[in-house]
Every structure is written in structure tokens, then in C-alpha cells.
């Protein structure tokens, strides 16, 4: 038994399922999860001391790589002044100014401690500002675990939502409408059915929780236009894509302007940080200037702000996103080339520092229903083969992969050589 396996057995005695977030349990791929001891650059190290080239990146935040010296130095310096004050600090002001300078649609921003808090608060604000109750989301998109967002489509994608988790009353879930991602007709159908009741659309501009699904041309702008037509707010959830797809997020990359934006992951530099911001007239509706209540004991924590600012400053380096995109393209297209070489059907998507691969004969994946038809057994086999080769991918066929600036030529080469060997063995076994 490895030390990771022993720790997992020990953890299950005191922690539900042995983990503090379900995907970490490896239920999507089978086997026992790795317990991580440390990380540096492009590598993580498990409790047994084995090194892995990491394409999870703490689920997105580690865009510069693990344990970056500038972020580490900023955190250590901040710790000298205290861990938490529960009062305003200059660091919060600096972070707000940095975010606003990088994302043109954000005129004011409020810090929170997680992506879930950000989306939950943005939706409450949208409901309060519009005085409407219903929200519109998309099947396969994840926006955190707030009750109103853990809703899937019922008997069809255009029906009223049903709870997708026990503990969510149906009377509450009925205010969440679910449309088909990358399908404007499904959105218009709902707006025509509820023309004065929908407060907002919330959308992952690149869906990263059904693997990696970019928007088709015109989709995001179509949502913007419909929100304007029916008086709803457009919330772009950039918790995953913010400062990862481009310096101004996916909204800048695709040229669409939301009313509100939610952020997380990258802005924390590895610390627990979220944020929501947007039009000043909407943000002024939040307490203490407005009637919509939102608060948080650790919001704007000085250690987290210091880590985030150090990372955000580093992301302003010229040419960084072009270099990151080139690394991502090489990995995604390298996986596809190896799969083609060995006669294993695969489709790929990638944008900025995100990528996805799908074991399927479908040429292009643009919707959730296509993702669910992919070959999960092939994914599991590939996953464990890559893990044995020292490459750590997301342990779920429904999660995006992430590159960092720490992934160099050697890491990319080793990863693609490993993929070639694993896919060759899969072809032999089949």
C-alpha cells in the first residue's frame, strides 16, 4: 500500500469520502487519489515522493506555476504584518484598481473568498437590481454550489429546472431555467416564455466543467443582445477563464461586454479569493450603498490580496498570453496527433491556457449532450496510463486541463511522449 492509499483510508474515517471536494476522490476514474505533499513549478509531488507534471494547476489558479517566487515573497512579507484584520486595507484598494484596469466592463468590484460566493452574490444582486426572480443558466455549466445553481434540465433542456442535489427544495429550484449551451434558440424560447421574469443569464464563456467547450461564433454576443432586448442582466462567470484565456478574460478575447463578471482562481494566486464586479449603477445596489446585502468575515484578506496582486502584476508581462496559448496548442494538438497515429478517435478543444480532449468519433464537441456520449472507459484507461507515466491530468472526463508558464520545453516533450506510449498501448489492448 502506498502512503497516498494509506492516507486515503485514514481520511475516510474523519472526512466524508476522504476528501474536501468530491472530484478529488477519483470516483470519475477509479482507484485511490494522490495525496500531495508539495509542488514547485510545473510539478507536484505525492506523499510517496513521486513527481508528476501537473495539468490540474489546483484547478486553474496556478497560471505561473506552483510556488512562484514572487508570490511566495509577497505572502511572506504580508504575514509579517498580521493574518487578518476584518477591516479595510490598502491592499484591497490596489486589487480593485488592478482588476478594473484589466477588465474594461468592470467599473466597481467587491472581494469575496470563493467563486461560489462570487456567483451567488452576483445573482442576488441581479435579482435585486431587476426586481425579478428567475435566472437562466446552461446545462453542463457549473457556477459553484449555491442552491439556485445546482440545477439541471428536467425532461428537456427547456423545461423548468429540477434539483440536481438532495437538499434543494423544488419550489426554490423552479426559479432556475436551463438552456442548451451554444444554442441561442433555446435561450430565446425561455425569454419568450418568461419575458418579464428573468433577472439574468449566467454563463461560463468557455464551459470548463463539461471538459472544455468554447462558445461558437456569435453565441456570447447573441446572449448580450437578448439580455438587452428583454431587460435582463448578463453575468459572465470568469472564475475559471478570468485572466487565463487573456489578460482581459474570455470577455475580452471574444469581444462581449457583460453587466456583471464573477472572478476567482487566478486572482488569488493560489489563495482563497473570489470577486464580482461590473457596471457602477448595478454595483451601487450592493450594501452599504444599496439594499442588496452581502458580507464576509475574510473578504479582502490581506494575505490573499498580496498573493493575488503579485500574480496579477506578473500577468501583465508582454507576450505572456501568446506564449501560454502556444504551449496549450502544442499539448492539445499533440494529443490529437498521437491519437490519430494509433487509430483512436479523439476530438480536442483549447483556448488560452485551457484545453480538453474527448475520446469520441465526433469531429467537434460544442454541447453537453455530445460530451456525455464520449468514451469514458477510454478516458479512464488513458488517465491511469498517464498517471503511471508521471503526468497528472484532471481525474474526470468533465474537467478542463490547464497549462502554466512553468511548463517548459522538457515538460511538454515528456508529456507528449508519454501520451504516445499510452495511446499505443490502448490500441494494442483493443
UniProtKB/Swiss-Prot annotation:
UniProt subcellular location: Cytoplasm
Residues the record lists as N6-(pyridoxal phosphate)lysine modifications: 265
Keywords tagged on the record: Cytoplasm, Isomerase, Porphyrin biosynthesis, Pyridoxal phosphate
Cofactor list: pyridoxal 5'-phosphate
GO biological process terms held by the UniProt record: protoporphyrinogen IX biosynthetic process
Top-level taxon of the source organism: Bacteria
Enzyme class: isomerase
CC per GO annotation: cytoplasm
E.C. no: 5.4.3.8
Reaction equation(s) it catalyzes: (S)-4-amino-5-oxopentanoate = 5-aminolevulinate
Signal peptide feature range: none
Pathway: Porphyrin-containing compound metabolism; protoporphyrin-IX biosynthesis; 5-aminolevulinate from L-glutamyl-tRNA(Glu): step 2/2
InterPro entries: 4pyrrol_synth_GluAld_NH2Trfase, Aminotrans_3, Aminotrans_3_PPA_site, PyrdxlP-dep_Trfase, PyrdxlP-dep_Trfase_major, PyrdxlP-dep_Trfase_small
One Pfam family hit: Aminotran_3
Molecular functions per Gene Ontology: glutamate-1-semialdehyde 2,1-aminomutase activity; pyridoxal phosphate binding; transaminase activity
Recorded family membership: Belongs to the class-III pyridoxal-phosphate-dependent aminotransferase family. HemL subfamily.
Subunit structure, as described in the record: Homodimer.
Matching HAMAP family: HemL_aminotrans_3
Protein name: Glutamate-1-semialdehyde 2,1-aminomutase
Organism listed in the record: Shewanella sp. (strain W3-18-1)
